[in-house]
């Protein structure tokens, strides 16, 4: 038997239940239909149990697919995650009123998973995770499942649960912590029709109509919110997400990865694109150290310096620039990046994301251009070569010092 704290104390001490002369044990929690039933912190305990189950499914079923050395693309890993593991993480939570105050553990776990796909550090910007993979936050996924469960109740108008939900919606106010009151809060948040009116006055819609409406309204809510966070994040100067969405389509930088040799190059490209690459300038902001370049003694070492201006790695630019311009000339011959004056101003941004709204319209490559993948292929190779050359020279410099 389970219950609230008062119930537990009452039945343990004052009036215990008995069966055949023996006391019925009173426990803090129990399992029923895959959920942890508890009078104390029920939502938190179910979230912790689901995280543990999801972690087991990650390593037991597809462990090699998610390892750091795995050479699957982030898009393939994300597809496997959404198909096999995300349902385990969200299983049963639609029947509980999961509020923002208790959602932190599952949100942190979700961020950790997405970062592992993109091979980004724990300090990488969160909006970049969502927009690169085209994925909604875990909060939105839980709310979609929650509203899908409401549709099931709405569609079965002769059941007891339909009457119970309607009664609670009629009697409860905004301070209620019931499932039905949480449903009303979500409908207000996402500008969905009032659930009480739907239960009272309307026949259930088709499943497709309700699913499309909820998915659209939830996406419309979260996209501007994440774009605002991206604009305020100093690390995302090169990753402009104003034209990116959270409807499942990945960023063009993740597409057209044709072989396993591109995967290590993609990792360096994404770290530079998201501002997660550790430069002397970034280190100076965090620790107060000297931001100058250790290789060429320039006053500031940042992403722009590493890719296009460092004299110590100038051979990388000399080798990669003609290859990049040849790819651009084939994909979009009128692109102004082919002009020398424009290169100095926009070259770094073009290398990291040639489809970015940061670039002028006549310098930007359309994301739907069938040859944009060839440009990103050169960009990945450029970022990887610059990073490898820089790392090798820094190691040689450290050996000379010692």
Name what the model sees in each region.
Residues 1-28, 49:
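Short, conserved micro-motifs composed of acidic
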Residues 30-40, 54, 80, 84-98, ...:
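Short, conserved catalytic/metal-binding micro-motifs enriched in Asp/Glu and His
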Residues 23-27, 68-84, 123-124, 132, ...:
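Structural motif
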Residues 105, 109-110, 115-271:
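Acidic catalytic cores of enzymes that act on phosphate-bearing nucleotides/polynucleotides
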Residues 41-44, 88-102, 276-280, 381-387, ...:
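Short helix-capping/linker segments at secondary-structure and domain boundaries
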Residues 38-46, 60-79, 91-104, 127:
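Short, solvent-exposed helix-loop connector elements
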Residues 64, 68, 236-402:
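Family-specific functional microsites
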Residues 67, 92-97, 123-131, 142-145, ...:
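Short coil/turn segments at secondary-structure boundaries
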């Amino acid at each position: 038997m389970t219950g609230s704290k008062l119930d537990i104390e009452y039945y343990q001490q004052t009036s215990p239940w008995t069966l055949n002369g023996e006391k019925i044990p009173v426990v803090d929690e129990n399992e029923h239909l895959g959920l942890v039933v508890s009078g104390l912190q029920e939502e938190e305990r179910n979230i912790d149990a689901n995280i543990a189950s999801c972690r087991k499914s990650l390593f037991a079923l597809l462990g090699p697919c998610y390892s750091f050395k795995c050479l699957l693309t982030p898009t393939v890993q994300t597809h496997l995650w959404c198909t096999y593991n995300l349902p385990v993480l969200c299983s049963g939570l639609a029947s509980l009123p999961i509020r923002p105050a208790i959602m932190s553990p599952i949100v942190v776990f979700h961020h950790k998973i997405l970062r592992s796909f993109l091979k980004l550090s724990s300090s990488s910007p969160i909006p970049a995770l969502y927009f690169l993979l085209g994925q909604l936050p875990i909060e939105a996924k839980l709310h979609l499942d929650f509203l899908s469960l409401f549709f099931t109740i709405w569609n079965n108008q002769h059941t007891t649960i339909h009457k119970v939900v309607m009664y609670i919606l009629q009697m409860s106010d905004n301070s209620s912590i019931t499932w039905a009151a949480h449903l009303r809060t979500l409908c207000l948040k996402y500008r969905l029709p009032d659930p009480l009116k739907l239960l009272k006055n309307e026949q259930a819609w088709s499943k497709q109509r309700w699913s499309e409406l909820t998915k659209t309204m939830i996406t419309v809510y979260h996209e501007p919110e994440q774009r605002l966070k991206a604009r305020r994040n100093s690390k995302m100067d090169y990753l402009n997400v104003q034209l990116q969405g959270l409807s499942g389509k990945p960023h063009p930088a993740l597409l057209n990865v044709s072989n396993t040799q591109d995967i290590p190059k993609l990792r360096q490209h994404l770290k530079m694109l998201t501002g997660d690459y550790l430069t002397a300038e970034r280190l100076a902001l965090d620790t107060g150290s000297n931001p100058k370049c250790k290789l060429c003694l320039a006053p500031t070492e940042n992403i722009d310096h590493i890719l296009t201006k460092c004299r110590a790695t100038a051979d990388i630019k000399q080798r990669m620039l003609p290859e990049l311009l040849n790819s651009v000339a084939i994909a979009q011959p009128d692109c102004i990046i082919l002009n020398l004056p424009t290169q100095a101003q926009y070259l770094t941004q073009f290398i990291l994301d040639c489809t970015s709204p940061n670039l002028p319209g006549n310098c930007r490559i359309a994301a739907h251009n069938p040859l944009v993948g060839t440009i990103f292929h050169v960009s990945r190779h450029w970022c990887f070569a610059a990073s490898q050359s820089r790392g090798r020279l820094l190691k040689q410099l450290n050996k000379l010092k010692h």
